[in-house]
Amino acid sequence: SADKQVTFSQGNLQYHPANNKWRFAENQSDYIGYANSNIAADYDGWIDLFGWGTGDAPTKSSTSYSDYSTFVDWGTNPIGADAPNTWRTLTNDEWMYIFYNRHNAQSLFAFGSVNGVNGTIILPDNWTTPSGVSFVASTTQGLSWDGSSYYNSNDNNFSHNTYTAEQWQTMEQAGAVFLPASGYRSGTD
């Protein structure tokens, strides 16, 4: 908006339990995948699929909502070379603005694939598609608004925007953001 802007990181947040270190993935389409099932306090590898609001306990994997009563943002930790509280999770109001409330919101996001990874593409308010690439809003291809949320009436929305790593670099340099659909956490799975 004219009075507020948010910044997205270069890639997914990742955590190394054995070293107690946080970092961002090198690319927006990078994600850990099945290795997330190794989640444990002493795991000597990187994970990037956390329980919601577990910034103070990133290896917590309970499936009970009562175990997550206090939200702790991951940004309270030092991430890479950044000091604690440099980064934070967007608020609900900020997500609502991006997907629903900003001018032309329905035309500024879509599902797509970057380098073979499915996810969501978010465009800035002042978007102009760069030459050499294309963009199709998923709302023109079967993603519908029901008055309170979007729902998918067509199962192939990820195929509407398919980019190679090089094509995505062009999109990213123009301000596009890609959030990989990396899965969901259910206990240690």
Regions found by a protein language model. Name each.
Residues 1-189:
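Conserved positions within compact, well-structured domain cores
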